[in-house]
Amino acid sequence: MTTVRTLPIRVPPVAGEALDSWLEALAHRSATAFGDLLAAVGLNPYHGTATNGWIVALTSEQASAITAATAVSRDALTTMTLAHYSGRAVNIHPETPTLKRAFPWGNARGSRYCPTCMKDNGGRWQLSWRLGWSFACTEHHRLLVDVCPRCCAVPRRRTHVGDLIPNIGCCAHPAPQANGRIPARCDA
């Protein structure tokens, strides 16, 4: 792993926020492509999987690197990963940062969301919305949305495109009928 430098811009996490949401907010505020921000905080931006392992749990090295770059504590970082729910809502393989599928209602594929919460908090995604049993917003008394209203994709099924600056709170899937190496985003 390369040496991580302290980032000049700070964006505090929102209470209950998912790690990838906070990193996207940091990239957005820094006007930096998501992949470049991931590299700057010591995460591999091109892991090659649908969702990176650091969304599930951070390794000790990853947590140390992110803490060094952002000054956010290791404990705060852990609460932004699914490891926060380990043993209660999900089970994580101890040797790899992957979820055990045998745990009922543990992890949903992608994430649901409350549009009102997203509007109120500036487009930040709650970690609890990723849990399979999370289906309603207790603050706004409404069902969580589980597909993009424009492109019908499951939100947050993959991490944000590494070559683009995140448009937080907007769908990052390719727009319907978009094509090319980096197609236009849905942005709903």
Protein language model regions, located:
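Short metal-coordination and nucleic-acid-contact micro-motifs, chiefly zinc-binding Cys/His arrays
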Residues: 107-110, 130-133, 141-145, 164-168
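Residue-level detector of solvent-exposed, low-hydrophobicity positions
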Residues: 26-29, 136, 140
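A structured, charge-rich N-terminal accessory region that forms the first stable segment of a protein
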Residues: 1-110, 118, 123
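Short, intrinsically disordered, charge-biased short linear motifs at domain edges
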Residues: 98-105, 122-127, 133-139, 151-162
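Generic alpha-helical propensity signal that fires on short helical segments
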Residues: 37, 50, 90, 95, ...
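SIR2/sirtuin NAD+-dependent deacylase catalytic core
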Residues: 113-116, 139
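Domain-exit/linker segments immediately C-terminal to small folded modules
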Residues: 6, 145-188
